[in-house]
Amino acid sequence: MRIGILAGSFNPVHIGHLAIANYLAEYEGYDKIWFLITPQNPLKNEGELMNQNLRLRLLQKSIKDYNRFEICTIEWGMPRPSYTIDVLWKLHLDFPQNIFELIIGSDNWIIFHHWKDYRTILENFKILVYPRSNYKSIYFNHPNIYFCKDAPQIEISSAFIRKSIVEGKDIRFYMPEGVCREVVNNLFRP
């Protein structure tokens, strides 16, 4: 089975995450998209993270009706900080019948060279880079890299949503309904 790994904090999950995953499942030939919830991104501030169990619950609510989406929490049991290379190897060893491909946005592609063992990732795993309108992709000719130029660009970020909630903005159309209500009612209020 060909599985796309969409890793992220999902802090909170929003329609941009879901639209990209849906596009990749429907148009790029993935059998499944696994949402890999990272407990802590080594390149981000941990202080802004919601509780990981809450992030899991919100993601479960968001994808429950689509059988090509699954959630992967394999990273939760790994030493912290955990790194993408270690997670990919663990997935490869634990599920040898599957082909795992890393999905990243062009915002992450431009800093990919800062990732731990990025060359090892590049040599051993396929990477699909999807476009983000505020980030120019640096195209790189390598057999394991695919630039998905036609994917829809939905420029919503979790940081934008958190900021909007704190400012009292109406963000109901940026997140699945049940998720939006729970986030607004319980989180990020000043």
From Swiss-Prot:
Gene3D superfamilies to which the protein is assigned, alphabetical: HUPs
GO terms assigned for molecular function: ATP binding; nicotinate-nucleotide adenylyltransferase activity
Keywords: ATP-binding, NAD, Nucleotide-binding, Nucleotidyltransferase, Pyridine nucleotide biosynthesis, Transferase
Catalyzed reactions: nicotinate beta-D-ribonucleotide + ATP + H(+) = deamido-NAD(+) + diphosphate
Keyword flag Nucleotidyltransferase: yes
SUPFAM superfamilies on file: Nucleotidylyl transferase (SSF52374)
GO terms under biological process: NAD biosynthetic process
Source superkingdom: Bacteria
Broadest EC class assigned to this enzyme: transferase
Pathway as given in its UniProt record: Cofactor biosynthesis; NAD(+) biosynthesis; deamido-NAD(+) from nicotinate D-ribonucleotide: step 1/1
EC numbers for this chain: 2.7.7.18
Transmembrane segments: none
Pfam families: CTP_transf_like
Protein family per UniProt: Belongs to the NadD family.
Job description of the protein: Catalyzes the reversible adenylation of nicotinate mononucleotide (NaMN) to nicotinic acid adenine dinucleotide (NaAD).
HAMAP family the UniProt entry points to: NaMN_adenylyltr
Descriptive protein name: Probable nicotinate-nucleotide adenylyltransferase
Originating organism: Azobacteroides pseudotrichonymphae genomovar. CFP2
Top-level taxonomy: Bacteria, Pseudomonadati, Bacteroidota, Bacteroidia, Bacteroidales
Gene: nadD
